Amino acid sequence: MNPLILSMILTTLAMGTMATMLSSNWLLAWMGLEMNMLAMIPILTMNPNPRSTEAATKYFLTQATASMLLMMAIMINFMLSGQWSITKLPNTTVSSMALAALMMKLGLAPFHFWVPEVTQGTSLTSGMILLTWQKLAPLSILYQIDTSVDITILTVSGLLSILVGGWGGLNQTQLRKILAYSSIAHMGWMLIIMPYNPSLTILNLLIYILMTLSIFMIMMNNHSTSTLTLALLWNKAPMMMILLTITLLSLGGLPPLSGFMPKWLIIHELTKNDSIILPMSMAMFALLNLYFYMRLIYSSSLTMFPSTNNMKMKWHFTNRSHLTLLPPLIILSTLTLPLTPFLSILE
């Protein structure tokens, strides 16, 4: 793609997200979401082939449906209340329609079916943007309307997302699909805690983005897209394999890594609100995710590939200039658990 066109597309993508995040007006927020969607489609088809075209079509149809539903909710809300403010959703039907539209945009269950298919059909770079940056705009709107929506819908959808995110990834061999199901599960955790403590949603999102970026950068560096290609990584780049293993364990929420912090704080917050069955169910469903992360680690680092590699340090001689961000990302996504006591300052 022409660098000038690519820079224009990325600028539009960033402007759309920022417009939605900074807006308290429904129309401006909706316009930001539309800019975001239209800029994402050429990114999905950056490497033109039938798979990417199909993925872009699925993405467009899903997002357009969600945008139409959201606009309908906005117009009904204006007819009833006479104002465009995002925080004013007096009607339960309107808030449920807006919530359904945002859940569809985020890929939350039961509107999650498009996420694995679209992620698998695109390049690693497009998939990385889809599973990280594209979550910001819809979540910022959800953050503003969390007091107006039904907490039961949030809880049921969140639990279903955690279950689907764990169950769907069990038989997968494609890394992009595994990360897509991981995204669905993490979004479920964020959705459940939002009515109780929205700050924990932001913390969870931040750590999730750091971990996902780290994994995608390692995959892009080694051109790994499946468990078969990942099995070669131990011979080609042992240090990258170690970093990937640690980051996957962090993504699964194992202590003493960073991924344990948001899960621990969310379960603690729910328990403080006299909820016992809900956090217990969330923790049990999260074991499904941990299982397929462990299976991924076992197949790639604890089994030797049946071939010899006479040049063990081949990876030292390749160009690593594009990996400047990887060390700080790895540190932030694995070693921030000791900072947990300082989070009390934010409360």
Swiss-Prot record:
Reaction catalysis annotation: a ubiquinone + NADH + 5 H(+)(in) = a ubiquinol + NAD(+) + 4 H(+)(out)
InterPro entries from the UniProt entry: Complex_I_Subunit_2, NADH_DH_su2_C, NADH_UbQ_OxRdtase_chain2, ND/Mrp_TM
Membrane topology: Multi-pass membrane protein
Predominant location category: mitochondrion
GO molecular function: NADH dehydrogenase (ubiquinone) activity
Residue ranges crossing the lipid bilayer per the database entry: 26-46, 60-80, 96-116, 123-143, 151-171, 178-198, 200-220, 240-260, 274-294, 325-345
Keyword Transport: yes
GO cellular component: mitochondrial inner membrane
One Pfam entry name: Proton_antipo_M
EC number: 7.1.1.2
Subcellular location: Mitochondrion inner membrane
Entry keywords, A to Z: Electron transport, Membrane, Mitochondrion, Mitochondrion inner membrane, NAD, Respiratory chain, Translocase, Transmembrane, Transmembrane helix, Transport, Ubiquinone
Class of this enzyme: translocase
One of the protein's GO biological processes: mitochondrial electron transport, NADH to ubiquinone
Subunit structure: Core subunit of respiratory chain NADH dehydrogenase (Complex I) which is composed of 45 different subunits. Interacts with TMEM242.
Described purpose of this protein according to its UniProt entry: Core subunit of the mitochondrial membrane respiratory chain NADH dehydrogenase (Complex I) which catalyzes electron transfer from NADH through the respiratory chain, using ubiquinone as an electron acceptor. Essential for the catalytic activity and assembly of complex I.
Family: Belongs to the complex I subunit 2 family.
Protein name, entry field: NADH-ubiquinone oxidoreductase chain 2
Source organism of this protein record: Dugong dugon (Dugong)
